[in-house]
């Protein structure tokens, strides 16, 4: 059995300059440790911990695919329920609650942002206190209650304003009606915020990660997960939205409630069969310790050859990948400087982990800090996607939505399906055609690097916004210069331009997501330490949440600033009197600036373990590794 050590070319040059250092990022200078006192430890040894852990693992019964009908069934109905409730919420707020379009868009963006922020809180609570099963149990019930409350706002006349019809001035909702609606949205925040970071991991928990069949099962489960997600979105944005828009809001909202109830029943039916992983404590404490220790030691001078002279005890049951030393954020290195006052336990661990941290802990924090600039650029990018999920709906409402000569009208909210369709189709093309072609050119297994994939998504987002501006200019010109098709409720005249012209901008946005969104998920997953994978998933949603809040702020600011401008309100209720194309062009400029910033950060970024092109795997015998650990222990 062999273990792997990852070194890059620069590491090997360093190694040649230090002949006595066999493994320059794990060996500890014995001279630095002599003044230290060692406290006797009454705790169990690493060997005892490992044996106890392995014994506990052997007792776990992994049922794998036998419990997948419960998990995937719950996933399918839960997604159908949530998306069925939320997909047409923008139209619901404007047509049933008589809210202005910009007010409804602001509420939707704030609501989406809160859900995405909730994933971070849920990931923390899940890993630290409750575990995934208990978190999901609360979340699915909360989703059912939220969907039920939203249904009541449509079914009970006293819970929504009087129907407006074609009136120009409509009665708005009362405070009580708004509060009842917000209560339903609050339940959905708790539910969706808990489900998103935990569902994937809970499904993967049901497979044995050490067996070949278990590993294959995990990969297949991920495929089924994303299939059900896309399936639920398409069904909700077509069939459910059509019923809500053309049959009845009450019937259209009963369907998601019934589906959420089925999701709860199916989930709890498998209660006795699930593998329920206990909460193991939050890795956020480790981050806090490194920062606290570095601040306490801020007056110390940096050590020479930090990869040798910094404290770097590695327990035998250490789960994370061993990282090489990096010379970025050197202030954090001070957390691993050993002073004469600090003590070690007999097993080599620091007696006070808030004053002394290992080099590995420091490098893990560096990984997270290094990701933040990329995450910031990705957050700005999501402004484009957030806008493409809202304003094309308003454009469709004032465009010709007729399909064929039969008089069938495509519901306005359904046009967002073209974004997801573009994303789904391009993913297949990317995986089957583009990656093999790029692989022959670049020599990379993935065709292009993760940051290159994200950057390609940013480029398509810019193209999407630019096309959106030209399409909106065309739509408004048709409405102002050619015969219209009547009046849209509470907005203005319907342009004779076909709403199918919105497909190019939405398709480009879908391609942007195929590059950037999936690239970000993979990037965070691979660049975060192994014990922070749940947070790696949540940071993606947190970025989308920040973007939703930024979109709300941007919409409100533009609406307020341009309300009395000579050119007119850019985001007026009647798009024919607005300048939505100016808004799109402004966003295009913002995305270009963000792209330039991203390129600078991508050039500065260092991948965890080294660049893909610069990695050499050096295999060392396990016996040699044990001897090295024994030498480290003796030096203590």
Swiss-Prot record:
Protein role: High-affinity, proton-dependent glucosinolate-specific transporter. Involved in the distribution of glucosinolates within the leaf, including import into the glucosinolate-rich S-cells located adjacent to the phloem. Involved in bidirectional long-distance transport of aliphatic but not indole glucosinolates. May be involved in removal of glucosinolates from the xylem in roots.
Start-end of Basic and acidic residues biased regions: 8-17
| Alphabetical keyword list | Cell membrane, Membrane, Phosphoprotein, Transmembrane, Transmembrane helix, Transport
Sorted alphabetically, which PANTHER family does this protein's record hold? OLIGOPEPTIDE TRANSPORTER-RELATED
Superkingdom is Eukaryota
Indicate the transmembrane segments per the record.
77-97, 105-125, 136-156, 175-195, 221-241, 249-269, 367-387, 410-430, 451-471, 499-519, 535-555, 582-602
- Family the UniProt entry places it in: Belongs to the major facilitator superfamily. Proton-dependent oligopeptide transporter (POT/PTR) (TC 2.A.17) family.
| Biological processes, Gene Ontology terms | glucosinolate transport; phloem glucosinolate loading
Tell me the tissue specificity.
Answer: Expressed in stems, flowers, siliques, roots, shoots and leaves. Expressed in veins and in adjacent mesophyll cells in leaves, and in the root vasculature with highest expression in lateral branching points.
Q: Drop me one GO molecular function for this one.
A: glucosinolate:proton symporter activity
> What name is this protein filed under?
Protein NRT1/ PTR FAMILY 2.10
Null mutant phenotype reads: No effect on the total glucosinolate levels in seeds. Gtr1 and gtr2 double mutant has no detectable glucosinolate in seeds.
Q: How does it sit in the membrane?
A: Multi-pass membrane protein
Give residues where Phosphoserine occurs: 52
Q: Where in the cell is it found?
A: Cell membrane
Do you know what upregulates this one? Up-regulated by wounding.
**Pfam family of the protein (one):** PTR2
InterPro entries given for it?
MFS_trans_sf, POT_fam
Cellular component aspect of the GO annotation? cytosol; Golgi apparatus; Golgi trans cisterna; plasma membrane; plasmodesma
Q: Where is this region: Disordered?
A: 1-45
């Amino acid at each position: 059995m062999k273990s792997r050590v990852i070194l890059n070319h620069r590491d090997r040059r360093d190694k040649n300059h230090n002949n006595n250092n066999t493994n320059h990022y794990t060996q500890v200078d014995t001279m630095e440790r002599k003044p230290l006192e060692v406290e006797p430890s009454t705790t169990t040894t690493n060997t005892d911990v490992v044996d106890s852990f392995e014994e506990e693992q052997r007792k776990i019964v992994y049922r794998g695919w036998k419990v997948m009908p419960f998990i995937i069934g719950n996933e399918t109905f839960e997604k159908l329920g949530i998306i069925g409730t939320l997909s047409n919420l923008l139209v619901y707020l404007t047509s049933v609650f008589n809210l202005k379009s910009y007010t409804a868009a602001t509420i939707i963006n704030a609501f989406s942002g809160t859900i995405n922020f909730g994933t971070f809180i849920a990931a923390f609570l899940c890993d630290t206190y409750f575990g995934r099963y208990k978190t999901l149990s609360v979340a699915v019930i909360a989703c059912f209650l939220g969907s039920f409350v939203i249904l009541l706002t449509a079914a009970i006349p006293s819970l929504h304003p009087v129907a407006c019809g074609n009136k120009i001035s409509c009665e708005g909702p009362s405070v009580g009606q708004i509060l009842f609606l917000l209560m339903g949205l609050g339940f959905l925040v708790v539910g969706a915020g808990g489900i998103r970071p935990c569902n994937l991991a809970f499904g993967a928990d049901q497979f044995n990660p050490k067996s070949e069949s278990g590993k294959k099962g995990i990969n297949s489960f991920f495929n089924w997960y994303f299939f059900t997600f896309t399936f639920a979105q398409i069904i909700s944005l077509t069939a459910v939205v059509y019923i809500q828009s053309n049959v009845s809001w009450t019937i259209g909202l009963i369907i998601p409630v019934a589906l959420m109830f089925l999701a709860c029943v199916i989930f709890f039916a498998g209660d006795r069969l699930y593998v329920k992983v206990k909460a193991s404590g939050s890795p956020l404490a480790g981050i806090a310790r490194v920062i606290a220790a570095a601040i306490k030691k801020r007056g110390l001078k940096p050590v020479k050859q930090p990869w040798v002279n910094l404290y770097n005890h590695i327990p035998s049951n250490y789960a994370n990948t061993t990282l090489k030393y990096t010379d970025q954020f050197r202030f954090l290195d001070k957390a691993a400087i050993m002073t004469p006052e600090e003590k070690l336990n007999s097993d080599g661990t620091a007696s006070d982990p808030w004053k002394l941290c290992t080099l590995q802990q420091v490098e893990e924090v560096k990984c997270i800090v290094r990701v933040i600039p990329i995450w910031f650029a990705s957050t700005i990018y999501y402004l484009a996607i957030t806008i493409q999920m809202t304003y094309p709906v308003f454009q469709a409402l004032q465009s010709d939505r007729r399909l064929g000569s039969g008089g069938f009208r495509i519901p306005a909210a359904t046009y967002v399906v073209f974004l997801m369709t573009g994303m789904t189709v391009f993913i297949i093309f990317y995986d089957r055609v583009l990656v093999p072609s790029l692989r022959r050119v670049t020599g990379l297994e993935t065709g292009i690097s993760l940051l290159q994939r994200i950057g390609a998504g940013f480029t398509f987002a810019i193209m999407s916004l630019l096309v959106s501006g030209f399409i909106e200019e065309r739509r408004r010109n048709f409405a102002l210069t050619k015969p219209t098709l009547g009046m849209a409720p509470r907005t203005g005249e319907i342009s004779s331009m076909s709403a199918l012209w919105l497909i190019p901008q939405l398709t480009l946005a879908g391609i942007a997501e195929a590059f950037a969104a999936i690239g970000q998920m993979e990037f965070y997953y691979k660049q975060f330490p192994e014990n922070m994978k749940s947070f790696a998933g949540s940071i993606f949603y947190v970025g989308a949440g920040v973007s939703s809040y930024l979109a709300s702020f941007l919409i409100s600011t533009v609406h307020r600033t341009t309300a009395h401008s000579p050119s007119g309100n850019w985001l007026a209720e009647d798009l024919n009197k607005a300048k939505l194309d100016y808004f799109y062009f402004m966003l295009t400029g913002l995305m270009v600036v963000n792209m330039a910033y991203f390129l600078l950060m991508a050039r500065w970024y260092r991948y965890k373990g080294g660049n893909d092109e610069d990695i050499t795997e050096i295999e060392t015998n396990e016996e040699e590794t044990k001897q090295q650990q024994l030498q480290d222990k003796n030096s203590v």
